[in-house]
């Protein structure tokens, strides 16, 4: 059975675990069609466009 040769330091352990402590904040960008703020890689709910292609028919 494998056994660690040295005790891992607190800073090494905490650095490894720190990735899980970061806040998950959604990234926003401007819609290329209407200029509305949209979460990245999602269809704009105001105009229905994503990457200059219309995917939703929005009735006003």
Swiss-Prot record:
One of its GO terms (biological process) is translation. Keywords: Ribonucleoprotein, Ribosomal protein. It comes from the Bacteria. Pfam families: Ribosomal_L32p. InterPro entries: Ribosomal_bL32 (IPR002677), Ribosomal_bL32_bact (IPR044957), Ribosomal_zn-bd (IPR011332). GO terms for cellular component: large ribosomal subunit. One of its GO terms (molecular function) is structural constituent of ribosome. Belongs to the bacterial ribosomal protein bL32 family. NCBIfam families: rpmF_bact (TIGR01031). This is Large ribosomal subunit protein bL32. The lineage of its organism: Bacteria, Pseudomonadati, Spirochaetota, Spirochaetia, Spirochaetales.
């Amino acid at each position: 059975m494998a056994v660690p040769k040295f005790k891992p330091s607190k800073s090494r352990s905490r650095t490894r675990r720190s990735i899980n402590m970061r806040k998950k904040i959604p990234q926003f960008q401007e819609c290329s069609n209407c200029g509305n703020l949209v979460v990245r890689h999602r269809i704009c709910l105001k105009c229905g466009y994503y990457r200059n292609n219309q995917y939703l028919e929005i009735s006003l």
